[in-house]
Amino acid sequence: MIGVCFGGYCPLHQGHLDVIMRAKKETDLCYVVVCGYESEPRGEDLGKDIKQRTQMVREFFRGDNLIKVISVNDTELGLDESMSENNWRIWTSYVKTRIPESDDLIFYVGEPRYTEDLKKVGYNSILVGYDYFRGCRVNDISASKIRENPLRWWRKIAYPFKPGLTKKILVLGTASEGKTTLVQDISKYFQIPCTTEFGRDYMEKSCMLDPDLYVKDFSEFLLGQYRYYCEALEDRGNPGVIISDTDNLVTLMYAKAYLGNPEMNITEEDYENILVPLAKSLHSLISWDKIYLIKPHNIFVDDGTRYMAQSSMSERNKNYEILVNLLKEFGLWGKVEILNGTYFEHFEILKNYINELYQV
């Protein structure tokens, strides 16, 4: 006997898994059918089309020999969203052609109406986890509830879908403004993943100072910072929020500030032809929900690694303006909140913002 489960999986969650796991336990093989329409609102809300969702569901069940994942594009089948008997007949006939072992199919479903619809087109089905007395599923979760408030239902979301639903916070500023301490303190307070400044880690590991840097090093900064971002998102301990200490715009800020400085090994051509295109390419893969920009205001701390020629308030203000312009150039200014208070005030602002995320 072959079990069939189906859904849009926008995202895959425990309610779906209740159905899939029962089918897997009661049949010889379970087919999970990822279905949906092109340009449908639920997929667009999630930011994942049917091909991407199919890949993510496959990733989740990777290594499970009792489950096979296939996709059905309802738009390509010419179906509308009426759930008519004719649509069901077309859809089930197509699904049957996709399953080689299709002589004895049984559908496992989570909605009562599906059992009636499938019966009309000649298929048996088993309703899983539905409470008729209450008129809802026993595990009362839905993809629409998750899309509306992912953090509330975080533990019920399948892992591959979590990075795309994570709230991502970025802290930016010039050197010696308390970014690293702020990010680390917030990370400890909420026990959320954080990223450090890759460029600084790279330079400390290589025993380099700013005048030792070439364009290849700045390129490494851009790629390394992106890797840090991905690692934080994919952290299994990610509880739905991550916070980052700087991103690629800070690398561009320093590179641009060093142009024309005879102590530095970077040219206008390096910046415009190599660094900016690379940063823009990586930027297309990154998103931020909130950006905090710290204004220059503190005493510059010489920790033995910072470039002291840029320690004056005048130079730091110039770098700050470069950063502001980059945020605007990259279309991020609308997400920016400027911080211009004390260390504790900054901490409280971020703490309150994250608390609000979890309380919605």
Regions found by a protein language model. Give the residues of each.
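Nucleotidyltransferase catalytic core that binds NTPs
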Residues: 1-166
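Hydrophobic positions on the alpha1 helix immediately C-terminal to the Walker A/P-loop
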Residues: 182
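Conserved glycine(s) of the Walker
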Residues: 178
